[in-house]
């Protein structure tokens, strides 16, 4: 991995906060498969090769299929994502792109058909966390390395 500065050494308190949030999201009410799909999709949208590489690798290790990983950028045209996953991915895209001042009521209600209040909050935190990691990684010049 190549990076511009050693941000874990320069800002240990800030990175501890990021890691604490990561720990929270891993223990959240959202299942691991959905969390990884969100992380991959948001990283694709943000163009973070380092995070795409990391999270596709993590997804494969947990048994995710190549088909679902490869087609994630076109999830809304596929029948092999669950309605819950599709709702989470739609919310992920909306929050990542921020096309308006708020999440539309229609989208909120579609997501809430599959997730309770706690899960909705957890989804938003997971989406925001991976967006933060993407921006840190891109700004610091992290690159996906060959294996």
UniProtKB/Swiss-Prot annotation:
Q: Which domain of life is it from?
A: Bacteria
Q: Name one GO molecular function term.
A: peroxiredoxin activity
- Gene, per the UniProt record: ydfG
Question: Protein name, please?
Answer: Uncharacterized protein YdfG
Transmembrane stretches in the record are none
Any one Pfam family match given in the protein's UniProt record, by short name: CMD
Q: Which organism is it from?
A: Bacillus subtilis (strain 168)
Listed InterPro entries: AhpD-like (IPR029032), AhpD_core (IPR004675), CMD-like (IPR003779)
